[in-house]
Design a protein with these regions (language model features):
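Extended recognition/assembly regions associated with phosphoester-bond processing machinery
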Residues: 1-147
Length: 147
């Protein structure tokens, strides 16, 4: 079964896609890529899955936004990944993968079995955001939480 962002591709029918992480199963991916411009945002561990087709960029600008793997301090309009943020709401069970955003940037969660995660309170993440920042916990129900 495709992970949540991959499962949304057939439903939303985007003209282009720019995944910021590992590709998943090649057969599923080939179907999703058909008829779309596919741009891989390269990570820090590899140059991108060149055998799977599409373009491979270290970062991509699209209007006022810049997509890159690792957030850069002081950047504006930035969408990144790398940190695999997770957050825990007191009394609400274990930490969950989370989107984190403020008025300047968005850090995407990781979807996968072996991705781990870094707490939103870790200085590597918290130093990137101005208050108020919001963590949106993923799961069967999105839970927005002020940081």
């Amino acid at each position: 079964m495709p992970l949540p962002p991959v499962a949304a591709v057939p439903v939303s029918a985007p003209e282009r896609a720019f995944p910021c992480g590992q590709p998943g199963h090649p057969c599923v991916l080939a179907r999703l890529q058909a008829g779309r411009r596919w741009i891989w945002i390269e990570g820090n561990h590899d140059p991108g899955p060149v055998e799977l087709g599409g373009s491979h960029l270290a970062e991509m600008r699209l209007g006022a936004l810049v997509y890159r793997h690792i957030a850069q301090k002081g950047a504006e309009g930035e969408v990144s990944g790398h940190y695999h943020p997770k957050h825990r709401v007191s009394g609400a069970g274990p930490a969950r993968a989370a989107f984190i955003y403020d008025q300047r940037r968005l850090i995407l969660p990781a979807y996968g079995t072996y991705t781990g995660g870094l707490s939103t309170t870790d200085p590597a993440i918290s130093a990137l955001f101005k208050r108020p920042a919001i963590a949106v916990l993923t799961g069967s129900r999105a839970i927005p939480t002020p940081l």
